[in-house]
Amino acid sequence: MKKLCVWAVAALLMAACTPKAEKATDSGLLQSNFQMEVNGKKTDLYTLRNKNNMEVCITNFGGRIVSVMVPDKDGQMRDVVLGFDSIQDYVSKPSDFGASIGRYANRINQGKFTLDGTEYQLPQNNYGHCLHGGPQGFQYRVFDAVQPNPQELELTYVAEDGEEGFPGNITCKVLMKLTDDNAIDIRYEAETDKPTIVNMTNHSYFNLDGDAARNEAHLLTIDADYYTPV
């Protein structure tokens, strides 16, 4: 009987010491792969989910949408955006995948602009032009994150006066909400202490047939009177 008790205690101790397997998101992501430190600030992975079990995963590194699991026409869940599986991949393979772009999205010709009579010279990181806020734009910064409920995430980044050549201290907020009609609502707010320019956007790469499929045969229709050639 004593030997049986010893074995029972040993089994209980082994069970107590065995770490519980980490549960992956529906898109197969592990939160631990997104928990590290970049430039002295902690990164993480945040998951939004609505009543339809649609899932959106976001990291505060660059305010990036990492995955979007949405039902297709047959009800099968598909990840319809491109993204990496870890922060290390985002750091070691620079890209704009899913990022919150700022301070100024798109190109600024020759990296120059004039505001209130003052000419500003920005980094020329794209064939002589300034692209997406420069080589260290918001997409490579760590945002402060607050998740007030399962369907919303608030991201905040404070850019200092002169960062990437832009004037003014500026507090930028990215408010992401997953609605119950399977839409991702993204709103941008910016507050500055002096005249500046700001133009933020999200840079997700979509594949509406799922990330494992090729998208060369997709047809995109833009319901607009005008568009800006790039």
Describe the function of each predicted region:
Residues 2-8:
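Sec-dependent signal peptide recognition
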Residues 14-16:
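C-terminal motif of bacterial Sec signal peptides marking the signal peptidase cleavage site
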Residues 18-54, 60-230:
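An exposed, glycine/acidic-rich loop-and-rim segment of catalytic or binding clefts
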